[in-house]
Amino acid sequence: MTDYTIRPMTIEDYEEVYALWTHIQGFGIRSIDDSKEDIVRFLERNPNTSAVAICDNKIVGNILCGHDGRQGSFYHVCVAKDYRRHGIATKMAVFCMRALQDAGINKITLIAFSENEGGNAFWRKIGWTSRSDDVNYYEFVLNENNITKFVQGE
């Protein structure tokens, strides 16, 4: 494998990154979060925290990374299959960690689907702690129908 570089993701990377996302097994893309418009908003809020890995003049890895002022989150951590096991994910993660530290953030969370055996093995191997025994993950899609149901207590 030739050398690779890690750099901040920009919106100009979106089409190539999105294409990468669609080829990763054990990975979830949601139209509600992952449209170009949504990623523009995400990158504007977190301009230097997401990363892409470039090798052979193409994007072969990506981490969407952001924070809310309190803790950081990794989203869509991926490396193209033919480029795995060369330290790319680790280098991207460190790039994002340093960007979060520069922003005063001292904790990161991520979600890995339970069936994503390779991803889960990677995070355990590099020292991340699974909280699946004491934390439930909930989500609530913000739309008028759901908010009305919430208010009505349904």
Regions found by a protein language model. Give the residues of each.
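Acetyl-CoA-dependent GNAT
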Residues: 8-76, 99, 130-134, 150-153
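Terminal substrate-recognition subdomain of acyl/acetyltransferases
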Residues: 125, 129, 135-154
